[in-house]
Amino acid sequence: MLILCMHTTYAQDIIGPIALEDLKKEPHAEWFTTEYENYAPFDKTITQLDAVQEDVAIVVFMGTWCSDSQMYVPAFFRILDEMEFLGEVQLIGVDKDKKTPTGSATENDITNVPTFIFYRDGKEINRIVESPVAFLEDDILAILSGADYKHTYEN
């Protein structure tokens, strides 16, 4: 008699509030660290971002299971680190149905991830949905500087 035993390990998805440090630990560190280190934002744009970051807070809805989140969220934090972002950033994990235990994804009309929502003085000013229109730092600059920005899914 032959008995085969197989063991499969699946990455645990994080649903609800996420501490950035949790993405820097396994099983998420593999993709987070690689994408963070490989992303090279444009220096000129970083300098411009520093001048428009006042009174900005950001909420990021992401799926640790989502390839777009795995690519853009680390790049986003690289940009924030390069510009020495001073505001608050809140990370929220969603399940594959784009839901959260508290209903915050539904309340914020999250249809695709990642979604980066930018607030100034407590009011939403705009959002990046799933992927940037140009480069991530260019989209952030357009939003924070008040340019006419439409995310990927806006008509």
Regions flagged by a language model, labelled:
Residues V60-T64, G87-T100:
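Thiol-based oxidoreductase modules, predominantly thioredoxin-like and allied folds used
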Residues N112, I117-E154:
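Non-catalytic, surface beta->alpha helical segment in thiol-disulfide oxidoreductase systems
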Residues I92-N112, L141-L144:
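Thioredoxin-like thiol-disulfide oxidoreductase module
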Residues L49-M83:
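Local sequence-structure signature of Cys/Sec-based thiol-disulfide redox active-site neighborhoods
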Residues Q12-Q53:
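N-terminal leader/targeting and pre-domain segments
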Residues M1-I14:
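Bacterial Sec-dependent N-terminal signal peptides
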Residues E54-A57, G87-E88, D121:
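Loop/turn elements at helix/coil->beta-strand transitions in domains of secreted/extracellular proteins
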